[in-house]
Structure formats: structure tokens, C-alpha cells
Amino acid sequence: LSFDQDEDAERNIVDNPHFTFVRSNFRYLKNFLRYHGIEQVDGILADLGVSSHHFDDSERGFSFRGDGPLDMRMNKRAGITAADVVNNYSEERLADIFYLYGELKNSRKIASVLAKARAIQPINTIGEFLEVIKPLFGREREKKELAKVFQALRIEVNHEMEALKEMLCAAAEVLRPGG
């Protein structure tokens, strides 16, 4: 079984009778194994990265190199967007997300400027988002810090930590001894 919650991944499906594509998050590993009549597996490979096409397509909202909707959802049909997070989470919760998932020392300042900006007008695009937060970073650190901010938002939007924990718990149950 191969899991990917992004429908765009279906374009890369291998035509092989031993391969089954599951358009879902790997957090549901145990459910789909049961559905396919599989009780145990010899190995599990989890790709925790983001595909380059996510960064290349500005309409997906994963990159600060272009403008488009502030989205960041791996599954375009589910969940909240990055704009939802930025516009609706409390300032404190935003700060926690930037600190925990982006390891940003100035997480409180980032959250504060976002809260002030969204009180005037909702932040819905990458361009609007960058206009608010870019002044917080020096030119020499800008790209590195923006990457951390975007990483933190992406992790929150897609509930990546929760999904990973669930998948690892399921993996411990279905992995054969010695697997």
C-alpha cells in the first residue's frame, strides 16, 4: 500500500498488481491494512517531506517565492487553510505554533504583528502575509526565517505531528517482529 493525501500524487501511480494507492493520510495505516485484509507487514517506509511540486505551484500556498492563496493543505479538499489559521487562531496560539514547529525565537512578535494586521484586513494571500512579516527579518536571515514560518504553518494546517504519532503507534502494532 502507498499512502498520499494529495490527489496530485495519483499521476505518479505505478501500474503493478502488487501496488495499491490509497489517497489518504498515513495516519489511517491500520484501517486501510485491515480493509485490504493485511494483518502484519514486513516494513514501513514513511516519506515525511513535501514534494517539490508543492513549492513550485504558487496556487498551493506552500512557498514564499510566489503569490497565491495562503493555503498549504496537502489534501485540497480537507481541513483548514493557512489563511484560516492566520486569521482565526488566537495570538497566543499562533506564537506557540511558530515557536514549536518553526523554532522561531521571535514567535511572539510574529504573532503580534499578524494579529494587528488581520484586525485591519484579513490575510488571504502569500503576498499579504509576506507584507506583514517580512519587515521582522533582516535581509541576511530573511529566507531562512521565512522558511521556518511557512514550515510551522504547514505543520499546523496538515496536523503533521498528530498524523505522525498516529502512524507510528499503528506501525508498532502491525509491524512483524524483526520487520
Label each residue range with its predicted role.
Residues 1-179:
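S-adenosyl-L-methionine-dependent methyltransferase catalytic core, i.e., the SAM/SAH-binding region
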